UniProtKB/Swiss-Prot annotation:
It is found in: Cytoplasm. GO terms for cellular component: cytoplasm. InterPro entries: Cell_div_SepF (IPR023052), Cell_div_SepF/SepF-rel (IPR007561), SepF-like_sf (IPR038594). Homodimer. Interacts with FtsZ. It comes from Clostridium tetani (strain Massachusetts / E88). This is Cell division protein SepF. Cell division protein that is part of the divisome complex and is recruited early to the Z-ring. Probably stimulates Z-ring formation, perhaps through the cross-linking of FtsZ protofilaments. Its function overlaps with FtsA. Keywords: Cell cycle, Cell division, Cytoplasm, Septation.
């Protein structure tokens, strides 16, 4: 009995003897009626997960949403825009610093979970981009130049 339990535990852990279950078969005579042949379809197992195919070359340009939240409750709308694939520019300058930090923390987590990026353009102004959009430094310089954000000056 202890041998059976030990064999089951070793089998569960993958440590069982490979040769224990091999059986040797004797040659069998061919079927008397050789005109009948067995038809079968091979079963192909694939370990690859079938992923969602997304076109890299899309003809539509990404939409940009500019948000100047007045309360923390607007964070849900910001995250919804990001989920919809929009680039979101958030101006949190007029918020209380603690509320602004909470908003940035929440949006940062949402951006991370969507594989996007969050970058600070200026103090209190952030750009959130979805995973399929890359913001280069030239664009950040243009956005932070004088006159681009009229609400900041």
């Amino acid at each position: 009995m202890a041998g059976k339990v030990l064999n089951k535990v070793m089998g569960f852990l993958g440590l069982e003897d490979e040769y224990e279950y091999e059986e040797y078969y004797e040659d069998t005579d061919e079927l008397e009626n050789s005109n009948e042949s067995a038809e079968f379809e091979p079963i192909i197992h694939s370990n690859k997960k079938q992923g969602k195919v997304v076109s890299i070359h899309s003809t539509s340009t990404p939409k940009v949403s500019i948000v100047k939240p007045k309360t923390y409750d607007e964070v849900v709308d910001i995250c919804d825009d990001l989920k919809d694939g929009k680039i979101v520019i958030v101006n949190s300058i007029e918020l209380d610093p603690k509320v602004g930090q909470r908003l940035v923390d929440f949006v940062s987590g949402a951006t991370y979970s969507l594989n996007g990026t969050l970058e600070e353009i200026e103090k209190g102004i952030y750009i959130l981009s979805p995973s399929n959009v890359e913001v280069d430094s030239e664009l950040k310089n243009q956005l932070s130049s004088k006159g681009m954000f009229s609400w900041n000056r």
